[in-house]
Amino acid sequence: MINKTKRLMVSRQVKIPRKTYFWGPTPNPGMHPKDQSVTLLSIIRDYLKLSDKEREAARILANGLVKVDGKTVREKKFAVGFMDVIEINGESYRVVYNDQGALVLMKETKERASMKLLKVRSKVIAPGNRIQLGTHDGRTFITDDKSKKVGDVWAVSVPDMKISEIIKMQPGNKAYITAGSHVNQTGTISKIEAKEGSSANLVHFQEGFSTIKDHVFMIGSSKFSFVLSPEEVIP
């Protein structure tokens, strides 16, 4: 089976030229879902324009010049997604969304690049009656702290992933929208509306819009704020 994707069929969340080549880059299975991730090959060649050819991009990676979340990565099909921090040639970038829901790069300072936000996506009981938590970027954490909830967002340091702040999904706290018609907007939660049955819970914002709970990514509280208003976005 050919592990390739036609460029015209690549997810619209990936901003690459559609007609330059026949085949498009296919991410390896990894931390982020295939349709919500971009390969490092695309980041180097199509986003940052640091190479013209795949071979040149592969050489940059092979030389250990690229880090993701503080760790060196050499695989050209390595998948990066929302909130990942990429360091290359002394510059740092964070993967965010634009107004069309496509993944883009936001330039970061070195200080801010040392931090990442993780959203808790799942919570299950692990062996030994411990708690296993899964985050939006595919990481797994084992803890005895039962107070941590799905929907919480953690501010962690990279690369050691130590939690410095926990932002709860609750009225008064600030959030970033990751999908839907309000993608790439920020707002302050006014109310969380629980729906009956299989309907998705709604989150209402002081700014006058609403979205489903799954699209809400917390970024601020009364004690902590993480600004996502990129002035320089690539491409």
Curated annotation (Swiss-Prot):
Keywords: Ribonucleoprotein, Ribosomal protein, RNA-binding, rRNA-binding. CDD domains: KOW_RPS4, S4. One of its GO terms (cellular component) is cytosolic small ribosomal subunit. SUPFAM superfamilies: Alpha-L RNA-binding motif. It comes from the Archaea. Gene3D superfamilies: 2.30.30.30, 2.40.50.740, RNA-binding S4 domain. One of its GO terms (biological process) is translation. InterPro entries: Rib_uL2_dom2, Ribosomal_eS4, Ribosomal_eS4_central_region, Ribosomal_eS4_central_sf, Ribosomal_eS4_KOW, S4_RNA-bd, S4_RNA-bd_sf. The keyword Ribonucleoprotein applies. One of its GO terms (molecular function) is rRNA binding. Residues 38-99 form the S4 RNA-binding domain. NCBIfam families: PRK04313.1 (NF003312). Belongs to the eukaryotic ribosomal protein eS4 family. This is Small ribosomal subunit protein eS4. It comes from Thermoplasma acidophilum (strain ATCC 25905 / DSM 1728 / JCM 9062 / NBRC 15155 / AMRC-C165).
